[in-house]
Amino acid sequence: MAYSFTEKKRIRKSFAKRATVHQVPFLLATQIESYTQFLQAETPPARRKSEGLQAAFNAIFPISSHNGLARMEFVSYHLSNPPFDVKECQQRGLTFHSALRAKVRLIINDRENPGKVKEVKEQEVYMGEIPLMTSTGSFVINGTERVIVSQLHRSPGVFFEHDKGKTHSSGKLLFSARIIPYRGSWLDFEFDPKDILYFRVDRRRKMPVTILLKSIGLTPEQILAHFFVFDNFTLQSEGAQLEFVPERLRGEVARFDIVDKNGRVVVEKDKRINAKHIRDLDSAGTKLISVPEDYLLGRVLAKNIIDPDTGEVIANANDELTETLLENLREAGVKDIQTLYTNDLDQGPYISQTLRADDTADQTAARIAIYRMMRPGEPPTEDAVEALFQRLFYSEESYDLSRVGRMKVNSRLSRPSGEGSMVLQDEDILETIKILVNLRNGKGEVDDIDHLGNRRVRCVGELAENQFRAGLSRVERAVKERLGQAETENLMPHDLINSKPISSAIREFFGSSQLSQFMDQTNPLSEITHKRRVSALGPGGLTRERAGFEVRDVHPTHYGRVCPIETPEGPNIGLINSLALYARLNEYGFLETPYRKVENSKLTDQVDYLSAIEEGKYVVAQANATVDAEGNLIDELVSAREGSERETRMVTPDRVQYIDVAPSQIVSAAASLVPFLEHDDANRALMGANMQRQAVPCLRPDKPLVGTGIERTVAVDSGTAVQATRGGVVDYVDAMRVVIRVNDDEAVAGEVGVDIYNLIKYTRSNQNTNINQRPMVKVGDIVARGDVIADGASTDLGELALGQNMLVAFMPWNGYNFEDSILISERVVAEDRYTSIHIEELSVVARDTKLGPEEITRDISNLAEAQLARLDESGITYIGAEVEAGDVLVGKVTPKGETQLTPEEKLLRAIFGEKASDVKDTSLRVPSGMSGIVIDVQVFTREGVTRDKRAQSIIDDELKRYRLDLNDQLRIVEGDAFQRLERMLLDKTVNGGPKKLAKGAKLTREYLADLDKYHWFDIRPADEEVAAQLEAVKEAIEQKRHEFDLAFEEKRKKLTQGDELPPGVIKMVKVYLAVKRRLQPGDKMAGRHGNKGVVSKIVPIEDMPYMADGTPADIVLNPLGVPSRMNVGQILETHLGWAARGLGQRIGDMLKASAKAQELRPLLAQIYNESGKAEDLDSLSDAEVLELAGNLKKGVPFATPVFDGAHEAEIRRMLDLAYPDDIAKERGLTASKQQVTLHDGRTGEAFERPVTLGVMHMLKLHHLVDDKMHARSTGPYSLVTQQPLGGKAQFGGQRFGEMEVWALEAYGASYVLQEMLTVKSDDVNGRTKVYENIVKGEHSIDAGMPESFNVLVKEIRSLGIDIDLDRY
């Protein structure tokens, strides 16, 4: 097995029993692929598929004018390069976008001869700006990173369901069908309690379904022929002869004696006809049965009956037979009649009854009835009626089933799936009604709307395409109106097209749609989870309030597609889900999951992705089925899922067709990071998965000792850890960047063979956490493509590291861990284990006001020099300044309105020229409760305003950094070129050269070394081919230099041009503060198993419980938090973590004793290769083994994959390996080595019982007490009620509500109560008086009238009731 550059530094020992045949796919693939397909920017115009932007243009163009003389055609589009890169957009508050330009052709036909083209104008037209996706699947909109969440919505198609008996009091099932298009009117069909079938369009008034059938051109005869089979009768003078159809009589009660053709009575009257009777009649060759007259009465005619002589209609189709009608028929000489065959069991007369309820006569009347329902009150003219009917379901402009919808309709109506148009067809309506009638007749099954075959995912690309199409259709309307003038006014395409509607539609979607969300950037996992989220909410989806239990519940088809664990707690539970680890979308937007093919009970290496619909056809076994070395299923019975319900049952191995690819395929990325998930209760697992997303990155990330093996995948796929895009040798490393000289075989001809990775340093995330990347390579390291070369936030050696590994004891400690509280050792704080850096952005803008411009300056009156000490001459704080609440960060003055001055003041001002009172101090200060260090300052200046020194120095630094990058590239390019030149020139004969090189001399290495490299080009080789190559290299180097100079110039232009600022803003300054947050009581912590708590006390290290060798515990947790919560995974993690720490200490002791690699190998082989997945340690060199051992000193990392993890026996074996008997005895371990005798840190006495002690990965969550704690003495008041505002953000007070008033009343504390309701709240005069009294030293209160009484009086007055208050 080949290990990557980073993997071999610290190999994670895996307990997995099953080898993976299918790697976890790239976790951001759904987002990135969807948007790539939408843009198709890299695809040449001729080869673009009709999807995304191309499909939108194709759908709207060509646009023709109303008179048909002019039309505009779409040729192609292209996206320009973005003006700023992602980082610049974030700094400047811009959108990372690209300009979309479409090439359109305006064709004008000749007026006299419309078939002849008069003029063609082709032009490229600006069509707005399209936001671009970053490499990590997010968007930068107005400087902030956002994510477009995928939407899980009901797939277009046809669906059949019933009301579950809830509508009618009798509990009768009322069946309904619904045809849902992607775009256009919904068509519903529904039965009422009287079994009449209705239809409605867009949930409007219902009408009998036969009106719709007539409107599509069917006559009542044709309608009946479609839905019924007929009984054929031949009328006799008395009674009639019925054509014998055996299956129609079975189960009926004979209303008369049934005789065969020989006259023998086969069935007596009032006897039920059974199978034997049918056989007897059949064997007797019975073709006709004589029936009495009353058997015909009440039957319904299937066809119109016309008098053959006169042509007069005697009876209409759907008429009931009566005695009179029968008489008339006989008189007219009608012999053969057809009636509808109906029964109460499986052939109901529903359509016949509906036809009776329908009073429309023909197609025209039916269409008018539909028009009146859709447009009540409007006169139904013939054209309007026809236009509306066509537009409802048959017009491609207003109705679109989409490929998905057509496929779903065809598959449900049992037709070939790919055929049919994207609008409704008459057969679709007919077949739908047929299936619905069959359902009512008890044939067939209704659909499950929560089945993932009926719900599809709309990804970013599709959502953006819909918005773009909406904007483009608005443009189409405007263009249509103006096209008529194109010829007369000689207009060009750009005169006709206004891109604003497109821009505004796109901007609205990306900026304020419910699915465009502020990216959760707390840590790499929260980023990746946010991008893999699937929401049922949003436009065209469900609403929280209306979503029932069924939609939220876990469905069997979620298996391997949607995670059953990870979903929010609260009102959104089950509506927001996460994609499972291996899930992907198919071309129709349905979720698929991979399964491994099984043939003849043997596993193959073929992996097929199946959608929920396809999976229903197969028998799929679980990944934990027992398999022998050859891949054969060896159990007699295997647990497998089969049938459309996907019920788990035991089947024989020969019936198995597929097997899961991995045990973890059922869960999402976050849930798969929880070790021993299989031992946790689902509710707690949900909390564990959710809380990992809230973990704050620590100062020094620490990989989890007990992981699941997915940590590396998440860290790399999130883009937090930097990967090498091409292999090569590390040429230069510092904290800011890594320079790699690319391998020759990976370098592209004509490109620079250098990759420069500028690392992100101390950057603020959306949640104010710190993003910082640290290089992991040194100069000379050889890296391959995909190797991790730098760690990011919460990653350690390329693995996700959300928390810290802590020595945890499960025991009570003086009540300080009551109710899930957590007791922490002072050592944890002293070692900065949970210290995190948070970056706050504070900004100030200088505006142009009516009274004059605001000014950013150091010159502020009435401020002491000490307060200005941290400002430079431009009035902006310097980097590195330590600031506290209230300190000035940026000095700013605002002009004040001129006040009316007295003559004396005017005189003084004239004499002393004092203008300070004209401006007021509006400087940016550090908000209350915040302190930190200034780590960055950015100054943005409007175009045309001169820059201050600070802004100029920032630009100079940026240019210096950029020049450094270019110089590095040039250095490596030239180095490579001169190496090649040296190989080429050595031992070549020359015609002359610098330093008096004689003709005919041969070039030596010494001569070339002595000569300045740039003078090599002055050598004149005798071989013309070598001379030509020398000249080519010279030109190539000069070309590169020229390119780099151009790039530098472009960068300089970009930096020195004015910044785009909001209207009225002259200058903007952003100051970034780094705030260090140490762990303190009140902070929330959690494990990965939903075991959360709040830090209650930080205890001195000497008071913590300690082991026999003196090692104190880091954290003490309450053991009572485990049994009732049923998250036993945390205990198993603790035991395995304890073994990991012990093994690390054994390796550390050996290294201390200067052990050689050969001595370490046997122990490493025991650890890695006794059970679980074997590791190829022999492939490592001795130096690599020693480096590996050095990284294992703090603990050997384990991987216990979800549902395929370590067993108890393996944990015990690892504990035995980590703690041989001598070490165990020395540390006070019990015989099982899972518990320890601990001593009380305060008394030194041993505790009565052994305690479970081990290592657990604990996280510090983003709920920090510093962000929540808040106190107010005085502050702002509400304008109307004059009561203090509420909330920390407003520096508000604590609400003293109704119940608190009751409490004071109950205690009789009348003065306290009076004070609370008046001077401490909204008694304006009283407040000022109290303040005055305190200043004077008088401690008395004069309570007045609270302002809220005045508000109440005013509100009552607004109702027209006058109230006066008298004071007594």
Curated annotation (Swiss-Prot):
Under the heading Pfam families, the entry gives:
RNA_pol_Rpb2_1 (PF04563), RNA_pol_Rpb2_2 (PF04561), RNA_pol_Rpb2_3 (PF04565), RNA_pol_Rpb2_45 (PF10385), RNA_pol_Rpb2_6 (PF00562), RNA_pol_Rpb2_7 (PF04560)
What's the name of the protein? DNA-directed RNA polymerase subunit beta
Give the matching InterPro entries: DNA-dir_RNA_pol_bsu_ext_1_sf, DNA-dir_RNA_pol_bsu_external_1, DNA-dir_RNA_pol_su2, DNA-dir_RNAP_su2_dom, DNA-dir_RNAP_su2_hyb_sf, RNA_pol_bsu_bac, RNA_pol_bsu_CS, RNA_pol_bsu_protrusion
Keywords, sorted A to Z: DNA-directed RNA polymerase, Nucleotidyltransferase, Transcription, Transferase
Per the record, the similarity remark reads: Belongs to the RNA polymerase beta chain family.
Any one cellular-component term (Gene Ontology): DNA-directed RNA polymerase complex
The EC number(s) this enzyme carries:
2.7.7.6
- Gene name linked to the record: rpoB
Gene3D superfamilies linked? 2.40.50.100, 2.40.50.150, 3.90.1100.10, DNA-directed RNA polymerase, beta subunit, external 1 domain, DNA-directed RNA polymerase, subunit 2, domain 6, RNA polymerase alpha subunit dimerisation domain, RNA polymerase Rpb2, domain 2
Fetch the SUPFAM superfamilies from UniProt.
Answer: beta and beta-prime subunits of DNA dependent RNA-polymerase
Native source organism of the sequence? Cupriavidus metallidurans (strain ATCC 43123 / DSM 2839 / NBRC 102507 / CH34) (Ralstonia metallidurans)
